[in-house]
Amino acid sequence: MNLNATLIGQLIAFALFVAFCMKYVWPPLIKAIEERQANIANALSSAEKAKQEQADSKVLAEQEIIKAKEEAQKIIDLATKRRNEILESVQADAEVERQRIIEQGHAEIDSERKRVQEELRQKVAALAVAGAERIVGRSVDTAANNDIIDKLVAEL
Protein backbone atom coordinates (compact mmCIF):
# COMPACT_ATOMS: atom_id res chain seq x y z
CA MET A 1 0.00 0.00 0.00
CA ASN A 2 1.25 3.38 -0.87
CA LEU A 3 1.09 5.96 1.88
CA ASN A 4 1.21 9.35 0.54
CA ALA A 5 0.87 12.85 1.89
CA THR A 6 -2.92 12.96 1.37
CA LEU A 7 -3.48 10.11 3.74
CA ILE A 8 -1.26 11.74 6.34
CA GLY A 9 -3.16 15.02 5.84
CA GLN A 10 -6.49 13.25 6.25
CA LEU A 11 -5.14 11.51 9.35
CA ILE A 12 -4.05 14.85 10.83
CA ALA A 13 -7.40 16.46 9.90
CA PHE A 14 -9.30 13.55 11.45
CA ALA A 15 -7.17 13.75 14.61
CA LEU A 16 -7.85 17.50 14.86
CA PHE A 17 -11.56 16.84 14.31
CA VAL A 18 -11.60 14.19 17.05
CA ALA A 19 -9.65 16.48 19.41
CA PHE A 20 -12.04 19.36 18.67
CA CYS A 21 -15.06 17.12 19.26
CA MET A 22 -13.53 15.75 22.49
CA LYS A 23 -12.77 19.27 23.73
CA TYR A 24 -15.92 21.19 22.71
CA VAL A 25 -18.69 18.82 21.59
CA TRP A 26 -18.33 15.76 23.83
CA PRO A 27 -18.50 17.50 27.29
CA PRO A 28 -21.86 19.21 26.66
CA LEU A 29 -23.30 15.95 25.30
CA ILE A 30 -22.07 14.01 28.34
CA LYS A 31 -23.38 16.77 30.62
CA ALA A 32 -26.82 16.66 28.93
CA ILE A 33 -26.92 12.86 29.16
CA GLU A 34 -25.94 12.94 32.86
CA GLU A 35 -28.58 15.62 33.57
CA ARG A 36 -31.23 13.51 31.86
CA GLN A 37 -30.12 10.44 33.82
CA ALA A 38 -30.34 12.49 37.04
CA ASN A 39 -33.78 13.83 36.07
CA ILE A 40 -35.00 10.34 35.22
CA ALA A 41 -33.58 8.97 38.49
CA ASN A 42 -35.24 11.82 40.43
CA ALA A 43 -38.53 11.24 38.62
CA LEU A 44 -38.39 7.51 39.34
CA SER A 45 -37.50 8.23 42.97
CA SER A 46 -40.34 10.75 43.24
CA ALA A 47 -42.74 8.31 41.61
CA GLU A 48 -41.70 5.57 44.02
CA LYS A 49 -41.99 7.98 46.94
CA ALA A 50 -45.43 9.11 45.73
CA LYS A 51 -46.50 5.50 45.31
CA GLN A 52 -45.34 4.73 48.86
CA GLU A 53 -47.10 7.85 50.19
CA GLN A 54 -50.26 6.81 48.36
CA ALA A 55 -50.07 3.34 49.88
CA ASP A 56 -49.48 4.87 53.33
CA SER A 57 -52.37 7.28 52.80
CA LYS A 58 -54.61 4.43 51.72
CA VAL A 59 -53.72 2.47 54.86
CA LEU A 60 -54.34 5.55 57.02
CA ALA A 61 -57.64 6.20 55.25
CA GLU A 62 -58.73 2.59 55.80
CA GLN A 63 -57.75 2.86 59.47
CA GLU A 64 -59.70 6.11 59.80
CA ILE A 65 -62.71 4.51 58.10
CA ILE A 66 -62.53 1.54 60.46
CA LYS A 67 -62.15 3.90 63.42
CA ALA A 68 -65.11 5.99 62.22
CA LYS A 69 -67.23 2.85 61.76
CA GLU A 70 -66.34 1.65 65.26
CA GLU A 71 -67.16 5.05 66.71
CA ALA A 72 -70.43 5.15 64.78
CA GLN A 73 -71.28 1.66 66.07
CA LYS A 74 -70.49 2.78 69.62
CA ILE A 75 -72.77 5.78 69.18
CA ILE A 76 -75.51 3.57 67.75
CA ASP A 77 -75.11 1.09 70.61
CA LEU A 78 -75.20 3.91 73.15
CA ALA A 79 -78.29 5.41 71.51
CA THR A 80 -79.98 2.00 71.45
CA LYS A 81 -79.13 1.45 75.10
CA ARG A 82 -80.42 4.91 76.01
CA ARG A 83 -83.59 4.31 73.97
CA ASN A 84 -84.17 1.01 75.79
CA GLU A 85 -83.60 2.70 79.15
CA ILE A 86 -86.06 5.44 78.25
CA LEU A 87 -88.61 2.88 77.03
CA GLU A 88 -88.24 0.86 80.22
CA SER A 89 -88.57 4.01 82.31
CA VAL A 90 -91.64 5.15 80.39
CA GLN A 91 -93.18 1.68 80.64
CA ALA A 92 -92.50 1.58 84.39
CA ASP A 93 -93.99 5.07 84.80
CA ALA A 94 -96.99 4.04 82.71
CA GLU A 95 -97.44 0.90 84.82
CA VAL A 96 -97.27 2.97 88.02
CA GLU A 97 -99.76 5.47 86.59
CA ARG A 98 -102.03 2.62 85.47
CA GLN A 99 -101.95 1.09 88.96
CA ARG A 100 -102.62 4.50 90.50
CA ILE A 101 -105.60 5.09 88.21
CA ILE A 102 -106.94 1.59 88.90
CA GLU A 103 -106.55 2.06 92.66
CA GLN A 104 -108.15 5.49 92.43
CA GLY A 105 -111.02 3.99 90.45
CA HIS A 106 -111.44 1.19 92.99
CA ALA A 107 -111.37 3.73 95.82
CA GLU A 108 -113.99 5.88 94.08
CA ILE A 109 -116.12 2.80 93.42
CA ASP A 110 -115.79 1.67 97.06
CA SER A 111 -116.63 5.12 98.43
CA GLU A 112 -119.58 5.45 96.04
CA ARG A 113 -120.75 1.95 96.97
CA LYS A 114 -120.51 2.79 100.70
CA ARG A 115 -122.33 6.07 100.15
CA VAL A 116 -125.09 4.33 98.18
CA GLN A 117 -125.31 1.56 100.79
CA GLU A 118 -125.58 4.12 103.58
CA GLU A 119 -128.19 6.05 101.62
CA LEU A 120 -130.06 2.82 100.93
CA ARG A 121 -129.90 1.84 104.60
CA GLN A 122 -131.28 5.20 105.62
CA LYS A 123 -134.09 4.96 103.04
CA VAL A 124 -134.87 1.37 104.08
CA ALA A 125 -134.87 2.41 107.72
CA ALA A 126 -137.07 5.42 106.96
CA LEU A 127 -139.44 3.19 104.96
CA ALA A 128 -139.46 0.65 107.76
CA VAL A 129 -140.26 3.34 110.32
CA ALA A 130 -142.92 4.80 108.03
CA GLY A 131 -144.38 1.35 107.52
CA ALA A 132 -144.26 0.65 111.22
CA GLU A 133 -145.96 4.00 111.97
CA ARG A 134 -148.73 3.16 109.60
CA ILE A 135 -149.10 -0.26 111.11
CA VAL A 136 -148.99 0.98 114.63
CA GLY A 137 -150.97 4.04 113.70
CA ARG A 138 -149.08 6.36 115.85
CA SER A 139 -145.84 8.21 115.64
CA VAL A 140 -142.86 7.24 117.67
CA ASP A 141 -140.83 10.08 119.11
CA THR A 142 -137.79 11.33 117.14
CA ALA A 143 -135.17 10.12 119.61
CA ALA A 144 -136.70 6.67 119.56
CA ASN A 145 -136.85 6.81 115.73
CA ASN A 146 -133.18 7.68 115.51
CA ASP A 147 -132.32 4.94 117.97
CA ILE A 148 -134.33 2.38 115.97
CA ILE A 149 -132.79 3.60 112.69
CA ASP A 150 -129.28 3.29 114.09
CA LYS A 151 -130.00 -0.24 115.25
CA LEU A 152 -131.45 -1.18 111.84
CA VAL A 153 -128.48 0.36 110.04
CA ALA A 154 -126.12 -1.58 112.26
CA GLU A 155 -128.01 -4.79 111.54
CA LEU A 156 -128.04 -4.21 107.78
Curated annotation (Swiss-Prot):
Topology of this chain in the membrane: Single-pass membrane protein
Superkingdom of origin: Bacteria
Major location category of this protein: membrane
Descriptive protein name: ATP synthase subunit b
Quaternary context: F-type ATPases have 2 components, F(1) - the catalytic core - and F(0) - the membrane proton channel. F(1) has five subunits: alpha(3), beta(3), gamma(1), delta(1), epsilon(1). F(0) has three main subunits: a(1), b(2) and c(10-14). The alpha and beta chains form an alternating ring which encloses part of the gamma chain. F(1) is attached to F(0) by a central stalk formed by the gamma and epsilon chains, while a peripheral stalk is formed by the delta and b chains.
Role summary: F(1)F(0) ATP synthase produces ATP from ADP in the presence of a proton or sodium gradient. F-type ATPases consist of two structural domains, F(1) containing the extramembraneous catalytic core and F(0) containing the membrane proton channel, linked together by a central stalk and a peripheral stalk. During catalysis, ATP synthesis in the catalytic domain of F(1) is coupled via a rotary mechanism of the central stalk subunits to proton translocation.
Keywords: ATP synthesis, Cell inner membrane, Cell membrane, CF(0), Hydrogen ion transport, Ion transport, Membrane, Transmembrane, Transmembrane helix, Transport
Transmembrane segments: 7-26
Subcellular localization: Cell inner membrane
Tagged with keyword Transport: yes
Example GO molecular function: proton-transporting ATPase activity, rotational mechanism
Chain's gene name: atpF
Cellular-component GO terms for this entry: plasma membrane; proton-transporting ATP synthase complex
Similarity field: Belongs to the ATPase B chain family.
